[in-house]
Every structure is written in C-alpha cells, then in structure tokens.
Amino acid sequence: MSGLFETLGRRALFTFDAEQAHGLSITGLKTGIVTCRTPEDPALSVKVAGLKFPNPLGMAAGYDKNAEVPDALLKLGFGFAEVGTLTPRPQSGNPRPRIFRLVDDKAVINRLGFNNEGHEAAFKRLSRRAGKSGIVGVNIGANKDAEDRIADYVAGIRRFYQLARYFTVNISSPNTPGLRNLQAREALHELLSRVLEARDEEGNMCTLKRPVFLKIAPDLTDEELDDIAAEADAQKLDGIIVSNTTLSRSGLKNPENSNETGGLSGAPLFERSTVVLARMRERVGPDMPLIGVGGIDSAETALAKIKAGADLVQLYSGLIYRGPGLPGEILRGLSTAIKYEGVSSIAELRDRDTKEWAARKLIS
C-alpha cells in the first residue's frame, strides 16, 4: 500500500496546503476509510518501563495533537500512539503558513508552536476510550505565555494520569521561545523533580505508576548530553526520547523552503538523531529505556535505530511521504530481520551498532 500511496495518494494530498492535508488525513482516520492489515509477530513484542508493547513502532507526537484518532492509529499497526503536545489552555500556535514540505529531501519544516485545543478537549476524547486496550501516551507541554512553565507540565501529569499509559515531557520543541532552556542542568533538575513528584503523588492515590519520558533535542553538545544523562539517572527517569526536530539544515538537496525557520524532520534528521541516540545510550548504560525518533521511513531505518540503542522507535514525517501502509511494511521488515539475524526477539538486536554510531561526526 505504501507504493500505491506514493504513486496516487500523495500526489492528491500534496495538491493541498500541508496543514489542510494533515486535516484531511485525520478526517480519513476518523471515518475509518483508512485501514491497513498488519502482521502480529510475538518476536516483535517489547517490554519497556513496565509496559508490554506489541511491537516497537510508535506514532510520534505532533500528528494527533488533540487526541482525535489514537485508536485508528493503532489499527494501522503501530504498537503505541502518542497524542499531543497538549498544553493546559488552548492556543493557536504561530501564524500560518507554518508547515513546509521539502519534497526532494522527504523532509518537513514546521514552526507550529504547540497549537492545540488544550487539556479539557483532549481529556474528554481520551475519557471516551477509557478501558480500551492499546498503549496511548500523552505528550505534555507548556503554554507560550505561562508564568510558571513547570507548573503546566505538572498540570498535564495530574489531568491525564488516569488516562495516559505513559507521559512524555516535551522541552525540546524549537518553536516555543525559551523552551529548550529547560534542558539545562539546573532547570532540568527542578522540572523533573516537580513532575516526578506529581507523578508519584498521583500514583500513590491509585496504585498505578505511569512512566515518564523526557524528549530531547538533537542539537545538544556532548556536555549537555552528559548533564541530561546524569540528571535522568539521579531522578530515576523512566526513559528518554531522542529526538525532536533539528535547527540544522545540513545535507539538504533543495534550497526551496530550507531557509524557513522552524524544526526540520524527516529523512535528513536520521543521521543526526541516530548519532545522538547512540551517544545517549553510551551515557545512560543498558538499563534506561531509549526511544529513537527522526528520519524513520523504512524497516532499514527503524532497525538501524534499534541497533544504535533504541528500545522503541517512533515516526511521523515518514507517514507523510510513504502513507498508511508504512507501519505494516516496517513491521514485516523487522520480522524478516529477526529471522535473518538468527535471534528470537527484536530486543536482542538492540545496541549491535551503538559504538559505531556514537563515533560518527556530526556536521552542524
């Protein structure tokens, strides 16, 4: 189906503005007209942070911003879906146009700015799926004008605690001024302390401990990675997602739209995000879960992330260019890789190439 989408479906969708096309795809998933058969392979099952994922492939945050179609995404074959980023109050984000396709590079630049309908709208939708199977995580953020941004993250933990299977603390979007400053050691210490305290308080009231992951940028120095790894270990964080979009424009083939401000995602992000993933794996050791994101558009790129150190992987931009058949294609490829490598599970392939990836040089 990926091939058919690339030939016909993408051509039709790409006649629309990028944001309109996104809205149409959400509508398609809501109506149920977009369905794909995907394989179920027990060898793809992965246990991470106390959760059993049917496979390691997830839908990254940013697509289903308002928790409209998480179950439809799971039906495409994703082992988990992440909704958001959600802020306490609704906000419109940055002015349009704010999404730019770089077709020759199979990439996207966005400067959306956490546009979403806020906690209450998403809470109502997620409440309707209470009790359903399937792992749905909630990506939480802060309102642009928040006086205390950390309080916004705490509010997200408390509001969605009963509904989220896990949380992602998003402090790495380049489109909210000053947000990435929360990755600095002192600020990160306060953020994680308050967020994890809220998680523990909520968990103690209902005997459920929800994992909390931290989503970081791919543009960090080795020293900044050192600080994040040390803080994550000290706070007993449940995992790290590597990575968000990049400010780098290295390696782009076509200059059209490349000078637009915002975060770059898609194929050009693969190398940088995978190097940073491997370097983080070297820092945190074998026990902390890592989720690899950035440039995944095939079974080969998904497998490379796993071999570089990822327990789980996520994609978004790849779906834009390859279509709804991509998850199934990736899962079939991973099943084939397990047999080819002569192992019994996908988890056994983790870290095979970590040292090689970590040693690669990054071009800014």
From Swiss-Prot:
Q: Name one Pfam family in it.
A: DHO_dh
Do you know which SUPFAM superfamilies this protein is assigned to?
FMN-linked oxidoreductases
Report the enzyme's class at the first EC level: oxidoreductase
Where it sits in the cell: the answer is: Cell membrane
State the protein's name. Answer: Dihydroorotate dehydrogenase (quinone)
Give the stretches traversing the membrane: none
The annotation note on the cofactor reads: Binds 1 FMN per subunit.
Per the record, the major location class is membrane
Q: Which NCBIfam families match?
A: PRK05286.1-2, PRK05286.2-5, pyrD_sub2
User: Which cofactors are reported in the record for this sequence?
Assistant: FMN
- Pathway connected to this protein: Pyrimidine metabolism; UMP biosynthesis via de novo pathway; orotate from (S)-dihydroorotate (quinone route): step 1/1
Chain sites annotated for binding substrate? K65, N110, R111, L112, G113, F114, N170, N175, N244, T245
Q: Catalysed reaction per UniProt?
A: (S)-dihydroorotate + a quinone = orotate + a quinol
Q: What are the GO BP annotations of this UniProt entry?
A: 'de novo' pyrimidine nucleobase biosynthetic process; 'de novo' UMP biosynthetic process
Family assignment from sequence similarity: Belongs to the dihydroorotate dehydrogenase family. Type 2 subfamily.
Residues annotated as binding FMN: A61, G62, Y63, D64, K65, T85, N139, N170, K215, S243, G266, G295, Y316, S317
| Keyword Disulfide bond assigned | no
Q: What does the subunit comment say? A: Monomer.
Query: Where do the catalytic residues lie?
Result: S173 (nucleophile)
Q: Which gene encodes it?
A: pyrD
Which GO CC annotations does the UniProt entry carry? cytoplasm; plasma membrane
Q: Which UniProt keywords apply?
A: Cell membrane, Flavoprotein, FMN, Membrane, Oxidoreductase, Pyrimidine biosynthesis
Q: What PROSITE patterns does the entry give?
A: DHODEHASE_1, DHODEHASE_2
EC number(s)?
Answer: 1.3.5.2
